[in-house]
Amino acid sequence: VFDKPLQPDDTQKYRAYYPHGKHFWNVGADYGYQHPRWSFNGETALNNNHAVATLNALSFQATGKLSLLALYRFYSYRYYSLFSEAFSDGGSVQNESGLYVGADWHPVRNLSVATYTDIAYSPWMKYRISGSSHSWDNLLSVVYSKGPFTLTGRYRLRIRQKDNAGKDALANEITQRCRWSAGYTARQWSGKVQADFCHYQFDGQTSSGWMVSGNGGWKPLVWLQLSSWIVYFHTDDYNSRVYTYERGMLYSFSFPAYYGKGVRYALWAKAQVNKHLSLTAKIGTTDYLDRDHISSGLQEIQQSAMTDLEMQLKWNF
């Protein structure tokens, strides 16, 4: 119960079933069953709009080397919950039904193969989608590890429907991503090189992008850790942007997107000053090669490079 009503702007039809009013309630039940080789669990909820959301998963250990997972969800377009979180393609527990099927296979020693396919349907319109729509997400990942060496290959195909340029029909937005990496981890140091590729297609338009990156870690002393990385990216536009992981502060997650042409380089360090105090710092610079300024408006930077600095002190009592 709120003292003031929620009043979303429902002049846009896709917002017609957003939460509104002052009084909300949700009731739900979770359930499950465990077996030595398979398990079933799920949760079903009902809201004050008398709409249902349910998520159910079935896992099966087919052999000692192969495990399977199936996950079904149904989130009514009339269902809403202010703080709910659950597996979905669209990012919210509303207006979606779908089936996810995945497998984890270890055919031989040191080799693992993971794959999934996920099909989803949304009966109600969404932002930039003026009707019911479908999506299809697929991933194949292969990892080979032997001793300190690791080789990884990954391919992802994602298809979503969106309004075309004329907004008179839906068109398929097709994004393909491929990644290859090789890593080495020793007692005091580690290194990794990675290559990423992206191809984007929508309504007759295409764009592509690629990125190469390398990072290294070193622990010269018991109390000191150092990491550095460098990235070169080259994409046609934002649609073919590329992503890479960056180590950051404790409890933070950094997975920035890069587009255009440029170089990113950064240094990370952590020092355990004593048993109570630790200091973590990171400094990085992104230098664009295809522009003379960055961003616009109040955030505009009148040069082609920008530097970011983070520091964190942690005291353990």
Predicted features, each with a name:
Residues 2-11, 16-317:
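Exposed, low-structure sequence patches enriched in small/polar residues
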